Structures are given as structure tokens and as C-alpha cells.
């Protein structure tokens, strides 16, 4: 289909293995020439679905639309791993997903944060949940709620260029420094209060 339509095609594949082997949950990216240019195996939540666990290495591929990267659904809940997307320079992150009503839209919101942290646009197509397309700052460009629409098509144009973000470099350092600062001021206040009561 990619070759026939002259498009980059991103597709999620859940292959059911014969008994005794583990099934695979993976994403495939094909070039307009029909070549498979990226494969990613899901690494998040495999214990629940009994699938082969990916190696937690997130690849990106250079295309005419800039650098593209992809993860699957629950993979987005691991910022320390997803920051590879920001380090790779990917401008667009594809996230095919399958949620359920009770968790919707939590995973979609988390994925928007992964885009902000890594300075990339996000295209999250969700079965049984909220599909979103965002720019690198988290602005919603398009959205579609699977439970409120009969036509499950989301259309939008996302920026292709990566925006600068410190998160891939420093990770959660700012958060930890803020926590330590808060702890310091609480201790200082407590000590000052005890000294003044003497």
C-alpha cells in the first residue's frame, strides 16, 4: 500500500503466535518505495498481554518529512526511555494505541507530555480512546474520541521540525532539585521554629 500510494505508512501489528511461543506487538514504518524502514517492539505492559518485550531502544528514521520515530501505547508511560526520541532529533512521534473506557483519556494526555518533553509533534491514533495530534508544545491540532464518533478518522497537519527541549539532556533533574529545595526550606523552617521556642 505504501508503494502504491507513494506514502510513508505506519502500521501497528499484533501477531498471534502458535502455542508455546509469545505473540508480538510491534509497529512497522514503510517508505514510499515499499521498504520496511523501522520496526519497534512494544516494551511497556507486555506482562499483561503476554507479548515479546522490546529492547527499549527507540529508533528514528530520516525521511523527506524529517526524522520520524514510533512507540506503542503503554511505551509512552516511561519518560526515561522515551527521551531517546528527543536525543535522536525526531520531529514527529507516532503512537498507535488501544485503550479502554476506564483509562481514557489518561494515556493520551501522558503521550502529549512525552511530545512536550522531547520537543516533537505527536500523532497518537487510539482504538477505544482519544486520538490526538499535537505540536511540540502540546497544542492540540486534531482530536477524535472513539466513543463519541462513528467515523474513526483523524485529520491534521503537525509541524515536522523538532523544537529544542532540555528534558532529553537533563531528564528529571529540575524536578529533583525542586524537591530538594522544598525539603531544605521545610527543614530550615522547622529548625528555626524550634530554636525560637527556647
Residue ranges and their predicted role:
Residues 18-88, 149:
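Active-site catalytic loop in hydrolytic enzyme cores
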Residues 101, 163-164:
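Membrane-proximal extracellular juxtamembrane segment immediately upstream
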Amino acid at each position: 500500500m505504501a508503494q502504491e500510494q507513494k506514502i510513508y505508512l505506519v502500521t501497528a501489528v499484533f501477531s498471534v503466535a502458535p502455542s508455546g511461543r509469545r505473540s508480538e506487538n510491534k509497529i512497522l514504518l514503510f517508505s514510499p518505495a515499499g521498504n520496511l524502514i523501522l520496526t519497534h517492539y512494544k516494551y511497556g505492559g507486555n506482562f499483561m498481554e503476554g507479548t515479546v518485550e522490546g529492547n527499549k531502544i527507540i529508533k528514528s528514521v530520516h525521511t523527506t518529512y524529517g526524522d520520524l520515530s514510533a512507540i506503542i501505547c503503554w511505551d509512552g508511560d516511561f519518560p526515561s526511555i522515551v527521551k531517546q526520541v528527543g536525543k535522536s532529533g525526531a520531529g514527529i512521534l507516532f503512537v498507535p494505541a488501544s485503550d479502554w473506557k476506564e483509562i481514557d483519556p489518561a494515556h493520551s494526555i501522558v503521550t502529549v507530555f512525552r511530545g512536550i518533553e522531547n520537543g516533537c509533534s505527536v500523532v497518537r491514533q487510539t482504538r477505544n480512546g482519544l486520538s490526538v495530534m499535537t505540536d511540540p508544545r502540546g497544542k492540540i491540532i486534531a482530536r477524535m474520541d472513539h466513543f463519541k464518533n462513528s467515523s474513526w478518522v483523524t485529520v491534521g497537519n503537525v509541524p515536522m521540525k523538532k523544537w529544542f527541549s532540555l528534558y532529553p539532556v537533563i531528564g528529571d533533574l529540575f524536578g529533583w532539585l525542586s524537591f530538594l529545595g522544598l525539603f531544605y526550606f521545610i527543614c530550615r523552617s522547622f529548625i528555626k521554629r524550634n530554636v525560637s521556642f527556647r
